[in-house]
Amino acid sequence: MPPKPAEKKPSSTAGKAPASSAGKAPAEAAKKTSKAPAKSGEKKKATKVRKETYSTYIYRVLKQVHPDTGISNKAMAILNSFVQDIFERIATEASKLASYNKKSTISSREIQTAVRLILPGELSKHAISEGTKSVTKFSSSK
């Protein structure tokens, strides 16, 4: 069996989302450049490596809740890490639930059950109500 490829670990720095980049995707906000191998005699072309973060969305929510408040890079990195961790936990639990029921598709029901299992008490109730509201809004917009 071939060895598994190494997983990329996100770096601990996430930049502030500037007000002018509100229309950009989160991956476009933070990019690295790496050199691609080139043939002899030709210039090396820099390729962009995408780094996906939730920084833009965290910044937008912050501005909706507290328009005059800023956020440091370190705080943004912590929040980004938190969102990624919760997302991964919910996705893993939903995947397990789908496999227990011999289904190959994760539906909103599996996500809802995963949230109930992962988040405690009142927090899960609020998360489920907000999720249901978002799904309803999305469905009605089609």
Curated annotation (Swiss-Prot):
Keywords per UniProt: Acetylation, Chromosome, DNA-binding, Isopeptide bond, Nucleosome core, Nucleus, Phosphoprotein, Ubl conjugation
Subcellular localization, as worded in the UniProt entry: Nucleus; Chromosome
Q: Where is this cross-link: Glycyl lysine isopeptide (Lys-Gly) (interchain with G-Cter in ubiquitin)?
A: K137
Source superkingdom: Eukaryota
SUPFAM superfamilies tied to this protein: Histone-fold
Q: Where is the composition biased (Basic and acidic residues)?
A: 1-10, 40-50
Q: Which family does it belong to?
A: Belongs to the histone H2B family.
UniProt region (Disordered), positions on chain: 1-50
Provide ranges: composition bias, Low complexity.
Answer: 11-28
UniProt keyword Ion transport, yes or no: no
Looking up InterPro entries in the UniProt record yields: Histone-fold, Histone_H2A/H2B/H3, Histone_H2B, HISTONE_H2B_site
Modified-residue entries (N6-acetyllysine), positions: K8, K9, K24
Q: What CDD domains does this protein's entry cite?
A: HFD_H2B (cd22910)
Could you describe the post-translational modifications of this protein? Monoubiquitinated by the UBC2-BRE1 complex to form H2BK123ub1. H2BK123ub1 gives a specific tag for epigenetic transcriptional activation and is also prerequisite for H3K4me and H3K79me formation. H2BK123ub1 also modulates the formation of double-strand breaks during meiosis and is a prerequisite for DNA-damage checkpoint activation. Acetylation of N-terminal lysines and particularly formation of H2BK11ac has a positive effect on transcription.
Name of the protein described by the UniProt record: Histone H2B
Name any one GO molecular function.
protein heterodimerization activity
